[in-house]
UniProtKB/Swiss-Prot annotation:
Its main location: mitochondrion. The modification N-acetylserine is found at residue 2. It comes from Homo sapiens (Human). Residues 2-102, 168-174, 250-266 are mitochondrial matrix. This is Sideroflexin-1. The keyword Transit peptide does not apply. The keyword Transcription regulation does not apply. Disulfide bonds: none annotated. It catalyses: L-serine(in) = L-serine(out); L-alanine(in) = L-alanine(out); L-cysteine(in) = L-cysteine(out). Signal peptide: none annotated. The lineage of its organism: Eukaryota, Metazoa, Chordata, Craniata, Vertebrata. Highly expressed in tissues with high one-carbon metabolism activity, such as blood, liver and kidney.
Length: 322
């Protein structure tokens, strides 16, 4: 290997310490960088070659550590971690901010009529379905039935919440009405994510010791993982759906937007995008990707199995998902 690059860099793990919030935030700011969706196929293939070659002990002359890490994050942003296949463009983490800012901005601009609510909630849940399918587990892929059930249920839940709250808020302040899309998105997340991961709730997710040695499967760990993901997804949407309504409520009373009402949607999308650039990585970083729980919180059968084989073990670890 080249003398410029140490041979033992672990590019299977993130570059920053994942036991700290700052380390996780740095990691997700890199993973969700929207500029990655602008990369050409040639740049993606170059990054894939660098990563694959390095894992085989082959390093191009002059490759630096920073260039290796850049290639690793480009590779991770575009290729599925289990299958190695190139992911659908809009399903990649780097597409989250531009896609969500557009959809959320439009949901919050066109929320007053039933057809608009139906259309934008359907668009939002269709996008969520693409993201969930793109980032599915390679070991336990989603079936068409599971994907369809989650998609239909989340769309129905979001639309019902939005239409119900629209009816309730007709006689209150217009500002309150602007928060209806956020309530619909929160309700949809509470439906969509557990349904999308229903197999994990039934059979459990793999739990390991600190060194990654597999100890069994736990549905209790799956419940904790899914709860953390639901919380982070709702909080991720909160700034972009809670701050712009106050700003737009003030702006729409000004002469500028009264004269140019068509500017409302672009301004709303821009405000949402600004919030999401920070909220997306920071909320992904709220909980460690490698989450943990006490052995005593596991199912009795798994507890007994672990206590028999690893009597000194106090905590188990698992991948919480995104």
């Amino acid at each position: 290997m080249s003398g410029e690059l140490p041979p033992n860099i672990n590019i299977k793990e993130p570059r920053w310490d994942q036991s700290t919030f700052i380390g996780r935030a740095n990691h997700f700011f890199t993973v969700t960088d929207p500029r990655n969706i602008l990369l050409t196929n040639e740049q993606l293939e170059s990054a894939r070659k660098i990563v694959h070659d390095y894992r085989q002990g082959i390093v191009p002359p002059g490759l630096t550590e920073n260039e290796l890490w850049r290639a690793k994050y480009i590779y991770d942003s575009a290729f599925h971690p289990d299958t190695g296949e190139k992911m659908i463009l809009i399903g990649r983490m780097s597409a989250q901010v531009p896609m969500n800012m557009t959809i959320t901005g439009c949901m919050m601009t066109f929320y007053r009529t039933t057809p608009a609510v139906l259309f934008w909630q359907w668009i939002n849940q269709s996008f969520n379905a693409v993201v969930n399918y793109t980032n599915r587990s390679g070991d336990a892929p989603l079936t068409v039935n599971e994907l369809g059930t989650a998609y239909v249920s989340a769309t129905t839940g979001a639309v019902a919440t939005a239409l119900g709250l629209n009816a309730l808020t007709k006689h209150v302040s217009p500002l309150i009405g602007r928060f209806v899309p956020f309530a619909a998105v929160a309700a949809a997340n509470c439906i969509n994510i557990p349904l999308m991961r229903q197999r994990e709730l039934k059979v459990g997710i793999p739990v390991t010791d600190e060194n990654g040695n597999r100890l069994g499967e736990s549905a209790n760990a799956a419940k904790q993982a899914i709860t953390q993901v639901v919380v982070s997804r709702i909080l991720m949407a909160a700034p972009g759906m809670a701050i712009p309504p106050f700003i737009m409520n003030t702006l729409e009373k000004k002469a500028f937007l009264k004269r140019f009402p068509w500017m409302s949607a672009p301004i709303q999308v821009g405000l949402v995008g600004f919030c999401l650039v920070f909220a997306t990585p920071l909320c992904c970083a709220l909980f460690p990707q490698k989450s943990s729980m006490s052995v005593t919180s596991l199912e009795a059968e798994l507890q007994a199995k672990i206590q028999e084989s690893h009597p000194e073990l106090r905590r188990v670890y698992f991948n919480k998902g995104l």
